[in-house]
């Protein structure tokens, strides 16, 4: 593999293809009411005083927060979630994309298939053009990974998928609520400020999940996908500053530390508490691995090299 080509691809990560065509507009429009209902229900759970998830001062400052659901994110980015003022923007494409990844992950896991194909798919979206796929179109996760349309009929797949999805949506919503609560500016003045804002938002979201005894399984999958898709420190400090939700090793290590320190709290309501504590610690170890990967320039180059060698047919290999 040409080293110059690899370095060029790493440097130009922010210029990924337009993924706004992942799903037909009619599909997104049909799914919008479902996501609107689910995310607003989740916001209501956070806001309900009897649940004691948001503290009184937090509820007061977050009063009037509204959720909006455009069909597409900026530039067709399927990982786009953001907030400004008292409004949190949750594009339907982004929500459906991640929900489909949760279904794919659960089905592959339940059938003891190769999990790495999810990372392969995400890296192909980031580093390859639509001509790398059949019909010269970027395919949605369930199509690209050949997940059967009956996957949800398996109760264990359904339950695991929903557990990933619901906990991820709770983390994403909590993260965006934090940006509003702390009044983080949309425009990041410095790289250091951007890092601080993201770490504060992560900590706030995880604290809400700790208070509600929700194990952040979906957050692990979200950041696993992000490690392979979103701009990070390996692509340079300027890109990290400009990214809406930049990744760096310190941010992921902070998440791991918070999970390790509060493992028993996240699992306190589980009837199998010992098993669930072990799960939280497993998730924390996963974040430590993601941090090591982000700190390894050779790993970042290897991601690009691997993506450039992949064929769409490889995504169906079990």
Question: Positions of the model-derived regions?
Answer:
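Mixed-charge, low-complexity intrinsically disordered segments
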Residues: 96-162
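Sec-dependent signal peptide recognition
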Residues: 2-8
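Hydrophobic h-region of N-terminal signal peptides that target proteins for export
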Residues: 9-16
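C-terminal capping/extension segments of zinc metalloprotease domains
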Residues: 16-87, 91-97, 144-146, 154-161, ...
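Long alpha-helical scaffolds
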Residues: 3, 79, 128-130, 219-220
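Short alpha-helix carrying the canonical HExxH Zn2+-binding catalytic motif
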Residues: 164-178
């Amino acid at each position: 593999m040409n080293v110059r080509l690899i370095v060029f691809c790493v440097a130009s990560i922010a210029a990924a293809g337009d993924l706004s065509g992942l799903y037909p507009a009619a599909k997104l429009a049909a799914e919008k009411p479902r996501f609107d209902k689910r995310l607003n229900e989740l916001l209501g759970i956070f806001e309900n005083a009897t649940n004691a998830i948001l503290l009184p001062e937090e509820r007061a400052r977050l009063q009037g927060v509204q959720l909006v659901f455009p069909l597409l994110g900026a530039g067709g980015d399927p990982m786009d979630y953001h907030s400004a003022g008292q409004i949190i923007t949750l594009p339907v494409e982004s929500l459906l994309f991640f929900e489909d990844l949760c279904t794919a992950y659960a089905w592959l896991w339940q059938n003891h298939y190769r999990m790495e194909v999810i990372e392969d798919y995400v890296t192909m979206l980031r580093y390859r053009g639509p001509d790398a796929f059949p019909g010269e179109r970027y395919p949605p996760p369930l199509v690209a990974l050949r997940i059967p349309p009956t996957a949800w009929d398996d109760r264990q797949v359904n339950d695991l998928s929903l557990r990933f999805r619901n906990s991820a949506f709770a983390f994403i919503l909590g993260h965006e609520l934090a940006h509003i609560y702390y009044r983080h500016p949309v425009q990041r003045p410095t790289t250091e400020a951007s890092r601080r804002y993201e770490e504060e938002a992560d900590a706030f979201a995880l604290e809400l999940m700790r208070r509600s005894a929700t194990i952040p399984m979906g957050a692990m999958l979200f950041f696993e996908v992000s490690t392979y898709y979103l701009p990070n420190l390996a692509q340079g400090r300027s890109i990290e500053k400009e990214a809406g939700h930049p990744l760096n090793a310190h941010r992921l290590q902070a998440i791991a530390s918070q999970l390790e320190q509060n493992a028993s709290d996240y699992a306190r309501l589980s009837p199998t508490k010992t098993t669930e504590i072990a799960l939280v610690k497993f998730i924390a170890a996963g974040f430590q691995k993601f941090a090591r990967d982000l700190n390894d320039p050779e790993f970042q180059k290897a991601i690009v090299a691997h993506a450039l060698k992949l064929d769409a047919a490889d995504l169906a290999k079990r």
